[in-house]
Amino acid sequence: MATITCTRFTEEYQLFEELGKGAFSVVRRCVKVLAGQEYAAKIINTKKLSARDHQKLEREARICRLLKHPNIVRLHDSISEEGHHYLIFDLVTGGELFEDIVAREYYSEADASHCIQQILEAVLHCHQMGVVHRDLKPENLLLASKLKGAAVKLADFGLAIEVEGEQQAWFGFAGTPGYLSPEVLRKDPYGKPVDLWACGVILYILLVGYPPFWDEDQHRLYQQIKAGAYDFPSPEWDTVTPEAKDLINKMLTINPSKRITAAEALKHPWISHRSTVASCMHRQETVDCLKKFNARRKLKGAILTTMLATRNFSGGKSGGNKKNDGVKESSESTNTTIEDEDTKVRKQEIIKVTEQLIEAISNGDFESYTKMCDPGMTAFEPEALGNLVEGLDFHRFYFENLWSRNSKPVHTTILNPHIHLMGDESACIAYIRITQYLDAGGIPRTAQSEETRVWHRRDGKWQIVHFHRSGAPSVLPH
């Protein structure tokens, strides 16, 4: 059967000069010939994409189609042709917000308030549409045009994810080092609050021209962030109003559940009553510091783009030392996006949830156990005498009549775990479980079982859909 190749982009659009270049894509000005309308085309070479990269590209296009807001760069079309994919966006000609600020003759706290208000409006729209950006930083804050008072536009949804309501889950280690939240660094479940943390970092920079967390050594930088170790040093912060500092404190709150939301931040007096609360004094020191900050960002960005351009899109076929191959390892990566969802990290995640499941079993915690199991879970285990068990009722019996009554210490060890990743949302783990316990007479015993568990991720949460346990029926392991 003949394959029909799409040529719609080639037929409808004419390409012009290059506007920007990433490691794996190029952005060029284009014109829709019949309408005479200008756009920016992000061109991705799909020949270099893995199946995983294709999924990410589809996710980005799907998310961008959802978002329609004056402070977000709009996606107008998404076209796939042989060897290339084209994302057709608004043509924004004003450049980066931070570059525009340093060219201004006058810049005050009130101007910073107006900037962060527009960023928060964009973030609020994202969150209302169930989208978390995950990569808010100066490079992704653009201006619609060169005209004075042009709108701030949020760009680059390459790392954005879809979430349900206020859902918190582990979506992978992703973002830009200096803007990462404590919960991401702790590898805790996360959600919309990560964007507000990044807004806090951006607002801090908007007011003084340098970031709240900074260290050339990435490990020390991450320690600072996890500890929330920032301050408002003299003399530059002495002229900043208490209300501005209060908003930063509310954004840079370590506990994500206590962190201010986008809707709440927009109601903060420093934003909602800008004309009477925010200072109008010109901040020359901020402009001078911001010039240095911009120069440092550009230099480091250029170095990393050059490094990354030599790698495959997935970074998996470079042939280099894998340990040093990721951007994550580089101290030069403070302003460069990373997405550390490589095989090693994902396998560690499966081991972690398996350990949590076994801990729930050892503690006789049926409630936690059920949260980690699909309601229709199937199982082969010795206690079922060769029968396939479906659902949780069979397992409930052991929790109610054995585990809940066992007050003696139990120690479990997982040996030789082998994990098979089956796409983004499924994984299989096989291992030997050694269980040490005290029998009825108080004598230490050891039991062994060979187990295979199949995990499936739904709405960001891993659940067991099937398991198989070998060995003789035993008193404790389940």
Curated annotation (Swiss-Prot):
Q: A Gene Ontology molecular-function term? A: calcium/calmodulin-dependent protein kinase activity
**Annotated binding of ATP, by residue:** L19, G20, K21, G22, A23, F24, S25, V26, V27, K42
Q: List localization entries.
A: Synapse; Postsynaptic density; Cell projection, Dendritic spine; Cell projection, Dendrite
Q: Compositional bias (Basic and acidic residues) spans?
A: 322-331
Phosphotyrosine occurs at Y13
Q: How is the protein modified post-translationally, according to the record?
A: Autophosphorylation of Thr-286 following activation by Ca(2+)/calmodulin. Phosphorylation of Thr-286 locks the kinase into an activated state.
Q: Where is this region: Calmodulin-binding?
A: 290-300
SUPFAM superfamilies of this UniProt entry? NTF2-like (SSF54427), Protein kinase-like (PK-like) (SSF56112)
- Region: Disordered, residue numbers: 314-341
In the record, biological process GO terms are: calcium ion transport; cellular response to interferon-beta; dendrite morphogenesis; dendritic spine development; G1/S transition of mitotic cell cycle; negative regulation of hydrolase activity; peptidyl-threonine autophosphorylation; positive regulation of calcium ion transport
EC number(s) reported in the record: 2.7.11.17
| Residue positions, PTM Phosphoserine | S257, S330, S331, S333, S404
Which cellular components does GO assign to this protein? calcium- and calmodulin-dependent protein kinase complex; dendritic spine; mitochondrion; postsynaptic density; Schaffer collateral - CA1 synapse; synapse
A Pfam family cross-referenced in the UniProt record is CaMKII_AD
Residue positions of the PTM Phosphothreonine? T286, T336, T337
Q: Which UniProt keywords apply?
A: ATP-binding, Calmodulin-binding, Cell projection, Cytoplasm, Kinase, Lipoprotein, Magnesium, Metal-binding, Nucleotide-binding, Palmitate, Phosphoprotein, Serine/threonine-protein kinase, Synapse, Transferase
Which cofactors does it use?
Mg(2+)
Sorted alphabetically, which InterPro entries does this protein's record hold? Ca/CaM-dep_prot_kinase-assoc, Kinase-like_dom_sf, NTF2-like_dom_sf, Prot_kinase_dom, Protein_kinase_ATP_BS, Ser/Thr_kinase_AS
Region described as Interaction with BAALC:
310-320
Q: Which ranges carry the Protein kinase domain? A: 13-271
What are the positions of the active site? D135
**What regulates this protein's activity?**
Activated by Ca(2+)/calmodulin. Binding of calmodulin results in conformational change that relieves intrasteric autoinhibition and allows autophosphorylation of Thr-286 which turns the kinase in a constitutively active form and confers to the kinase a Ca(2+)-independent activity.
Assigned protein family: Belongs to the protein kinase superfamily. CAMK Ser/Thr protein kinase family. CaMK subfamily.
Subunit notes for this chain?
A: There are 4 genes encoding calcium/calmodulin-dependent protein kinase type II chains: CAMK2A, CAMK2B, CAMK2G and CAMK2D. The corresponding proteins assemble into homo- or heteromultimeric holoenzymes composed of 12 subunits with two hexameric rings stacked one on top of the other. Interacts with BAALC. Interacts with MPDZ. Interacts with SYN1. Interacts with CAMK2N2. Interacts with SYNGAP1. Interacts with SYNPO2. Interacts with SHANK3. Interacts with GRIN2B. Interacts with CACNB2. Interacts with LRRC7. Interacts with GRM5.
Q: What does this protein do?
A: Calcium/calmodulin-dependent protein kinase that functions autonomously after Ca(2+)/calmodulin-binding and autophosphorylation, and is involved in various processes, such as synaptic plasticity, neurotransmitter release and long-term potentiation. Member of the NMDAR signaling complex in excitatory synapses, it regulates NMDAR-dependent potentiation of the AMPAR and therefore excitatory synaptic transmission. Regulates dendritic spine development. Also regulates the migration of developing neurons. Phosphorylates the transcription factor FOXO3 to activate its transcriptional activity.
Q: What is the protein named?
A: Calcium/calmodulin-dependent protein kinase type II subunit alpha
Q: Which organism is it from?
A: Mus musculus (Mouse)
